[in-house]
Amino acid sequence: DMVRSHIERSTPNKVDYFKSTLEQLYGIKTTLKHMKVDTDKLRPTQDRVYADELEGRTYELKRGLAEPAIVVKTGNRWILVDGHHRSVASKKLGCEKVDSYVIDLGQDIRLGMEKTADEAGIKTFDDITIIDDDQHPLIALTETIKDQQYKED
């Protein structure tokens, strides 16, 4: 869980990289804010989350350890870029807001990830499937590596 948490972190570098990518891609200047965003305003862009990862994010949220999500504000839309497990866990816990890094585009630009979400029929958190019968790929990889190291010892 510790390894996964480090990889899943919304580090300032990760946020800055995504911010600069948007600026270059669309030829705009964005602003960055750290704020709470209403869960009902968030537009997810991912169609599934893994139950084991959801359990980890729920644990972190209950203890105040969860990293902020990454959200893009474009026009009057709040697009969830990173933090689907955290946001679903927040919603399940009854939280009305999600701690987020918000990249504000300052104008209405339809993002590619919005188009992809539209094509997949993802509009709200109700459209996200929780996968119970499989592990998050990162957890499966971590456990495979641990098993290999155990066999070598």
Write out the residue ranges for each language-model feature:
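N-terminal leader/domain-start detector
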Residues: D1-K29
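Exposed alpha-helical structural elements
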Residues: M2, Y17, E53-G56, G112, ...
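Polar low-complexity intrinsically disordered regions enriched in Ser/Thr and small residues
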Residues: V3-R4, T30, Y59, E67, ...
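Generic secondary-structure transition motif, activating predominantly at the C-termini of alpha-helices
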Residues: I7, T11, Y26, K62, ...
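Intrinsic-disorder-associated interaction segments
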Residues: E8-V15, M35, G106, I131-D134
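Short alpha-helix boundary/capping and kink motifs at helix termini
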Residues: F18-V81, H85, K91
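Basic- and aromatic-enriched surface patches that contact anionic nucleotides/nucleic acids
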Residues: G75-D153
